[in-house]
């Protein structure tokens, strides 16, 4: 049997999973990762703790699997995106805590860029909106606020990377300073048409090019792990940002296929194929995981400009499963997150109650930072069960709004709306939520047999570059649905419910 090791470095934990060649989980290990909150709106990680926890889980997963490192064909890395690390090339020590993707400290600099009229040019090159979410503005802040950082960067003494780059650096004992196109595309510094760092964007944010890692396709040779770390050197063969990795792990390889990850928030991606398309409906365009060129197509897989182009439309919901956490921890309405399904199931519907969980504003496709959470439609007959059901349904409403926006963009480009939605993430195990999602969308919702699709995507990318697999067609044959939720609701009723939702959104933003 041949094995693959996936490192899944997330915001709240570091995990490692050993997969067999059929994409089945053999063993896994996980450690929580603490977040640091220096002041309101600021979120940081200790980069050394990211590294220590990830290495520890990799060793633990191999031990649980009962295999030696030389039985592993390749390592794949999936990581939280946008989180920014800056370190000293000589010592390998970070010069500051990592600035996490949720961190908003760079918003004033982003507002200045918008006021200066750069939004159109940046979106045309990167597919992104100007926002503190993305790495470029975080890196600019570090260079401007860490004493001596800008001068050291200009002397070539520092290295920048998203979490994947940091892990590759540590895994190879500083021999490789690399990233992949899907992570690079989240920096607001990569021209996604050329897969190269854009000199104009670097100059605009005053970022020395010497800081930047080399960009490779997502399935490529990222070097070998140092032999002393895992007991044997293993090729790092696949790297992707977590959401693009999940899209790959869901076997969404062709235009029009889509997945939604139901976690603390929700992340929906629709594959665009090789066609770059900006959204007219509040969505982002980003690079999907990209493969090395086919034989004869170029000079080698280390040339990102020659990668097989693949793009995705993306929308993010700020509050998904977090609304259940709020019911548990904030209202103490339930004792465990798992208890919400039984409570919601105790009533046939939400009884006209509508919840808009805009605790931190509304993300795509609305982009209403001023929105605040609301519960409407309450009557004397409303119960805690109705509120619980409305909270659960709010996740589906927000996701439906995303998919409808994607459908409008797809049709405008001459394509067709999404015909099925593949789902993953912790909340996808909730049958009531998945059925209501299918009812709202009017298309099947498919839950895979392996819901750890983020790690699986990284493993598949590593397997392709190491010739364990030979094509995405082969991977598509491995994908299996554990359950298929067919829509049961009359379409007129579904449209009526969505109209009620949009009315509730307008109320939540009427400030």
From Swiss-Prot:
It catalyses: glycerol + ATP = sn-glycerol 3-phosphate + ADP + H(+). This is Glycerol kinase. Sn-glycerol 3-phosphate binds at residues 11, 81-82, 133, 242. GO terms for biological process: glycerol catabolic process; glycerol metabolic process; glycerol-3-phosphate metabolic process. Signal peptide: none annotated. InterPro entries: ATPase_NBD, Carb_kinase_FGGY, Carb_kinase_FGGY_CS, FGGY_C, FGGY_N, Glycerol_kin. Pathway: Polyol metabolism; glycerol degradation via glycerol kinase pathway; sn-glycerol 3-phosphate from glycerol: step 1/1. One of its GO terms (cellular component) is cytosol. Keywords: ATP-binding, Glycerol metabolism, Kinase, Nucleotide-binding, Transferase. ATP binds at residues 11-13, 264, 321, 325, 426. The keyword rRNA-binding does not apply. The keyword ATP-binding applies. Belongs to the FGGY kinase family. Inhibited by fructose 1,6-bisphosphate (FBP). It comes from the Bacteria. Glycerol binds at residues 81-82, 133, 242-243. Key enzyme in the regulation of glycerol uptake and metabolism. Catalyzes the phosphorylation of glycerol to yield sn-glycerol 3-phosphate. NCBIfam families: glycerol_kin, PRK00047.1. Its EC number is 2.7.1.30. ADP binds at residues 11, 15, 264, 321, 426, 430. Gene3D superfamilies: 3.30.420.40. GO terms for molecular function: ATP binding; glycerol kinase activity.
């Amino acid at each position: 049997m041949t094995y693959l090791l996936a490192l899944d470095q997330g915001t709240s934990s570091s995990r490692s999973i050993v997969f067999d060649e059929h994409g089945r989980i053999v063993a896994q290990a996980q450690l929580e990762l603490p977040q640091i909150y220096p002041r309101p709106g600021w979120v940081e990680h200790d980069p050394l703790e990211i590294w220590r926890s990830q290495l520890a889980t990799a060793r633990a997963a191999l031990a649980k699997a009962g295999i030696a490192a030389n039985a592993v064909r390749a390592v794949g890395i999936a990581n939280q995106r946008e989180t920014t690390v800056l370190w000293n090339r000589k010592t390998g020590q970070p010069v500051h805590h990592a600035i996490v993707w949720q961190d908003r400290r760079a918003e004033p600099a982003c507002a200045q860029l918008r006021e200066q009229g750069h939004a159109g040019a940046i979106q045309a090159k990167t597919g992104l909106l100007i926002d503190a979410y993305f790495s470029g503005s975080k890196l600019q802040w570090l260079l401007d606020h860490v004493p001596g950082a800008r001068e050291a960067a200009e002397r070539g003494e520092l290295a920048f990377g998203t979490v994947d780059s940091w892990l590759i650096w540590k895994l190879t004992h500083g021999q490789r300073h690399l990233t992949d196109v899907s992570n690079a595309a989240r920096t607001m510094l990569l021209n996604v048409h050329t897969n190269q760092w854009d000199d104009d964007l670097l100059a605009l944010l005053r970022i020395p090019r010497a800081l930047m890692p080399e960009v490779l396709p997502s399935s490529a040779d990222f070097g070998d792990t140092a032999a002393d770390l895992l007991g044997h050197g293993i090729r790092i063969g696949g790297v992707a940002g977590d959401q693009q990795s999940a899209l790959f792990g869901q076997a969404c390889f062709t235009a029009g296929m889509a997945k939604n990850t139901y976690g603390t928030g929700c992340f929906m991606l629709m594959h665009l194929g090789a066609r770059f398309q900006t959204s007219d409906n509040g969505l982002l365009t980003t690079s999907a995981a990209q493969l090395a060129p086919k034989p004869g197509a170029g000079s080698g897989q280390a040339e990102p400009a020659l990668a097989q182009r693949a793009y995705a439309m993306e929308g993010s919901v700020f509050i998904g499963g977090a609304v259940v956490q709020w019911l548990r921890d904030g209202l103490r309405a339930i004792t465990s997150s798992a208890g919400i399904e039984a409570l919601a199931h105790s009533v046939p519907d939400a009884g006209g109650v509508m919840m808009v969980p805009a605790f931190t504003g509304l993300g795509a496709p609305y982009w209403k930072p001023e929105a605040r959470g609301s519960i409407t439609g309450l009557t004397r007959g409303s119960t805690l069960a109705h509120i619980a059901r409305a909270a659960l349904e709010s996740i589906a409403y927000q996701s439906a709004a995303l998919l409808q926006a994607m459908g409008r963009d797809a049709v405008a480009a001459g394509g067709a709306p999404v015909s099925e939605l593949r789902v993953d993430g912790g909340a996808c195990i909730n049958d009531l939520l998945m059925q209501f999602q299918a009812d709202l969308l009017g298309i099947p919702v498919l839950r895979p047999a392996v819901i750890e699709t983020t790690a699986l995507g990284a493993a598949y990318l590593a397997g392709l570059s190491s010739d364990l697999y030979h094509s995405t067609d082969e991977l598509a044959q491995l994908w299996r649905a554990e359950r298929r939720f067919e829509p049961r609701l009359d379409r007129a009723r579904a449209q009526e419910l969505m109209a009620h939702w949009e009315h509730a959104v307008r109320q939540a933003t009427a400030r």
